[in-house]
């Protein structure tokens, strides 16, 4: 994939779990070198929910050639990462709000496997949480909702956060760090976020997995709206 290309990361948490396998195959068939699989891992502690664990994500990874975009909403990612079969083709994002020792240990594990390292920031989290790790970062995931559950309304204070982050990264001379957005990424909102500087769009219930249109059609519409 091109470094600054616009990418759709399909949130499998938002898919129908009973048709997950065939939907992954459908995504592969409609890939224009601009798709990833977004895999949410939660521990019931950092967020008050449970989703996929390493066994499930490893099984999903075994049936696809698409890159995987792991989002760990957990307090101790260093205890999850060794059990996960991510590779150099994948993105692995942990949260900036966990303790420093966990972040540092996780960076070591992720970088040793050659994967891309990311930090997520919650709606109220300051960019300063990112600063100690800028030299390691490949991606920053901007949460537009409080993490934990699909289908939430966007937090209004995040509406201009991508533009602000892009400016902040430019000032720090880290222009090549990718910006991803997650939560409430509707088609209309994706267009604005793309113009503001977002590179990766997590497609969930607002933008990709819709009951009234096919997955293929949703992809076509979302693609058109993130191209600038």
PLM features: what roles do these ranges have?
Residues 6-11, 37-39, 68-72, 90-94, ...:
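Hydrophobic faces of well-ordered beta-strands that scaffold small-molecule active sites
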Residues 23, 78-86, 125-135, 184-201:
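Catalytic cores of alpha/beta
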Residues 19, 90-177:
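Conserved anion-binding
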Residues 20, 40, 84, 140, ...:
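Conserved, mostly hydrophobic/aromatic
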Residues 94-100, 144-153, 196-218:
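Glycine-rich phosphate-binding active-site loops on the catalytic face of alpha/beta enzymes
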Residues 50, 54-70, 112-118, 158-179, ...:
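Alpha-helix-loop-beta-strand connector modules within alpha/beta enzyme cores
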């Amino acid at each position: 994939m091109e470094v600054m290309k616009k990418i759709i990361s399909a949130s499998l948490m938002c898919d129908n779990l009973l048709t997950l396998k065939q939907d992954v195959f459908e995504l592969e068939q409609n890939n224009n070198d601009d798709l990833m699989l977004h895999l949410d891992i939660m521990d019931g502690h950092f967020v008050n929910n449970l989703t996929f664990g390493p066994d499930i994500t490893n099984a999903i990874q075994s049936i696809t050639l698409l890159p995987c975009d792991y989002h760990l909403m957990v307090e101790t990612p260093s205890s999850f990462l060794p059990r996960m079969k991510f590779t150099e083709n994948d993105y692995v994002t942990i949260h900036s709000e966990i303790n420093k020792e966990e972040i540092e240990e996780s960076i070591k594990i992720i970088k040793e496997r050659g994967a891309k390292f990311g930090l997520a920031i919650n709606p109220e989290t300051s960019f300063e949480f990112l600063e100690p790790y800028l030299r390691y970062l490949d991606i920053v995931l901007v949460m537009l909702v409080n993490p934990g559950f699909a289908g939430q309304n966007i937090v209004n204070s995040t509406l201009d956060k991508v533009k602000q982050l892009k400016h902040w990264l430019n000032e720090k001379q880290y222009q090549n760090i990718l910006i991803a957005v997650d939560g409430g990424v509707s088609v209309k909102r994706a267009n604005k976020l793309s113009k503001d500087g977002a590179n990766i769009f997590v497609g969930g219930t607002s933008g990709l997995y819709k009951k009234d249109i096919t997955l293929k059609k949703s992809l076509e519409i979302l693609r058109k709206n993130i191209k600038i």
